Amino acid sequence: MAHNHWCNLFSVALVCVVALVMVQYSVAQNSPQDYVDAHNAARSAVNVGPVTWDESVAAFARQYAQSRAGDCRLVHSGDPRYGENLAFGSGFELTGRNAVDMWVAERNDYNPNTNTCAPGKVCGHYTQVVWRNSVRIGCARVRCNNGAWFITCNYSPPGNYAGQRPY
């Protein structure tokens, strides 16, 4: 009987530790510093200076993300004060780091010599991440009513101006 009691206590403790690690991992992939670090790694790779977290930009991102929680549609805010990258994930837990990594993966479709995307490809998320003049960011992540994840990163000043190079 005592053996079963200790086994049950051990099992409960193990479940709690695993749950704590999972929560910690999830939080660790969504902190302001995680967003900043992911952006700055991409920027550093092309010799662009770092971004910093801006709480006023982040407040806008949070407000906009909350407004999308009802339908989780990838619709841009249209606010001219900010550049904006959006991400959506369903069927898995999309983290902020995942979103930035998806945007940065578009670098393979960007030709810096011609300042164009490969035919039929998208690369504007990547160019916003590395846009030299966009030096302040704020990002937010929400769980939508349908269970999917919506992430926005906003950039100040905005980038992706037609005919201009990101770096």
Swiss-Prot record:
GO CC, alphabetical: extracellular region
SMART domains: SCP (SM00198)
Disulfide bond keyword on record: yes
SUPFAM superfamilies: PR-1-like
GO biological process, one term: defense response
Keywords: Disulfide bond, Pathogenesis-related protein, Plant defense, Signal
Residues in the signal sequence: 1-29
Stated role: Probably involved in the defense reaction of plants against pathogens.
Family: Belongs to the CRISP family.
Protein name, as recorded: Pathogenesis-related protein PR-1 type
Organism annotation: Sambucus nigra (European elder)
